[in-house]
Amino acid sequence: MTTEIMNELKSKMEKSIESLQRDFAAIRAGHANANLLDRVSVVYYGAETPVQQLAGISVPEPRMLLVTPYDKTSIDDILKAINMANLGVNPTSDGNVIRITVPALTEERRKELVKEAKKEAENSKIAIRNIRRDANDALKKAEKAGDITEDDLKSFSDDVQAETDKFIKKIDELTASKEKDILEV
């Protein structure tokens, strides 16, 4: 019972960290990165489709992305979706490929991005704390049901807190790394 609770706790916390890493990857740090287009979806034959499924994305230069559609007829739809995604980039098309020039970030924009990264990190910390609360509630129910003793409850609650602290520390490390990446000129 308690092993299941701890395994579920770790699994959910790891998923929360993975989600944060995906969110951080989508925050552009002033250099071209294929992850910049992760959240861009294109309406293609009536269905929302991620741009990665419609085109090859490469980084030929530090400040340029090259989007090569597999189906040339989708190029206008992809261009429109990139423009509507409000990524702060200027895509241009020559009919065969889309070139996205990633402009250098201003100091003000860098600070906004750091603030956004910190907000994402705080949301992840809240998720981790909610997972901790759920695990502690499950342990208390197990104790009331007589599945574990009061001493076991204390011991497992300490384990839950140790896991929580470990994942919060990981979030802080990821945030510091992303902040450094964003502020690097």
Swiss-Prot record:
GO terms for biological process: translational termination. Gene3D superfamilies: 3.30.1360.40, Ribosome-recycling factor. Keywords: Cytoplasm, Protein biosynthesis. Transmembrane segments: none annotated. GO terms for cellular component: cytoplasm. SUPFAM superfamilies: Ribosome recycling factor, RRF (SSF55194). Its main location: cytoplasm. GO terms for molecular function: ribosomal large subunit binding. InterPro entries: Ribosome_recyc_fac, Ribosome_recyc_fac_dom, RRF_sf. It is found in: Cytoplasm. Belongs to the RRF family. Responsible for the release of ribosomes from messenger RNA at the termination of protein biosynthesis. May increase the efficiency of translation by recycling ribosomes from one round of translation to another. This is Ribosome-recycling factor. It comes from Macrococcus caseolyticus (strain JCSC5402). The gene is frr.
